[in-house]
Regions:
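Secretory-pathway/luminal and periplasmic proteins that interact with or process carbohydrate-rich
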Residues: 38-45, 115-125, 184-191
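Histidine- and aromatic-rich ligand-binding microenvironments
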Residues: 21-23, 30-37, 44-45, 49-51, ...
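Alpha-helical scaffold elements that line and support the substrate/ligand-binding pocket
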Residues: 1-17, 33, 69-70, 83-112, ...
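Active-site-proximal loop and beta-strand segments within enzyme catalytic domains
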Residues: 2-84
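Catalytic loop of the DD-peptidase/beta-lactamase superfamily, centered on the K-T-G motif
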Residues: 97, 102, 106-110, 114, ...
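Short, charged, amphipathic alpha-helices and their helix-cap/turn boundaries
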Residues: 50-77, 102-124, 129-135
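Short, well-structured active-site flanking segments
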Residues: 9-28, 99-127, 172-177
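Flexible glycine/proline-enriched surface loops and loop-helix/loop-strand junctions
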Residues: 73-78, 89, 138-147
Length: 271
């Protein structure tokens, strides 16, 4: 999601899309899509979706997914609520394709990955694309089930991407600040490091113990979970990406936070 957000915000940077202009033929804006405030549902709510994935079926077409979900029907008025929605990011992908006149993978590569120096990341589009990956039990998984796209590559590339993005190597300061302006989503989450979790424009952001703020993203994929976060302390910063098989978001987040705090502490001692 962060890669899609960075790509979409590069369109805003270049004056090709307005962050707060309604998307064509819709009531919501790009900002609302990016921050999950557009009123859309999520295909993860469909029991049939999870059953089909578990049975190693071929992915439905995007049109069939939207029909099964009733995805065009808003669940609340845009801007008045919050609901995590992969459908929103699927629509962001379509917006990127329409504005750039490029396939999504080419647009993301040209506008986000290549400018940030990433050369070992690609979209998985077929089952064969996952054969040499370390994503847990993926031998029969169809990556087309991820309707907004499934990026794969070395875990180090995820850390490099986030670190360079948040260091300002792609977006101007004002737009980067917009990206990191988060909607607070309640209080502490049991089993996870967040004290005040929040969501910005394609990034999870919030405070953790010690008064530090994390910015990045956690995500569950086929048979695995990844967390990549950046933390700052004055002029010092650290970025870490972690991966493990299974589906425990809290466990991988705890590991990443531990590594980040150790890195900051070592930096302070060296100073």
């Amino acid at each position: 999601k962060t890669a899609l957000a960075a790509t979409a915000l590069s369109l805003v940077r270049d004056g090709l899309v307005g962050l707060d202009d309604p998307i064509r033929d819709q009531l919501f804006t790009l900002r609302q899509l990016l921050r999950h405030e557009a009123g859309l549902a999520d295909y993860g709510e469909l029991a049939d979706y999870h059953a089909a994935v578990a049975n190693h079926e071929a992915a439905w077409s995007a049109d069939e997914m939207m029909q099964r979900l009733g995805g065009a029907r808003l669940r609340y008025s845009p801007g008045t609520g919050w609901r995590y929605s992969n459908v929103g990011y699927f629509l962001i992908g379509r917006l990127i394709e329409r504005v750039t006149d490029l396939a999504l993978e080419e647009a993301v590569s040209r506008r986000a990955l290549t400018p940030l120096g990433l050369s070992r990341v690609r979209f998985a589009k077929t089952r064969a694309d996952l054969q040499n990956s370390h994503l847990g039990n993926t031998s029969n998984y169809d990556p087309a089930w991820v309707y907004h796209g499934l990026l794969i590559g070395p875990i180090s590339q995820a850390a490099l991407f986030l670190d360079r993005l948040l260091a300002g190597h792609l977006l101007p300061p004002g737009l980067l600040q917009e990206m990191q302006t988060a909607k607070t989503l309640g209080g502490p989450i049991p089993g996870r490091p967040w004290i005040t979790p929040g969501y910005g424009l394609g990034v999870m952001q919030g405070s953790i113990e010690g008064g530090f703020t994390l910015c990045g993203h956690t995500g569950c994929g086929p048979g695995s979970v990844i967390a990549v976060y950046r933390i700052c302390d004055g002029n010092a910063s650290a970025c870490c990406a972690g991966f493990e098989t299974g589906a425990s978001e809290g466990a991988i987040e705890a590991l990443v936070v531990q590594k980040l705090m150790q890195t900051l502490q070592l930096g302070a001692e060296d100073a």
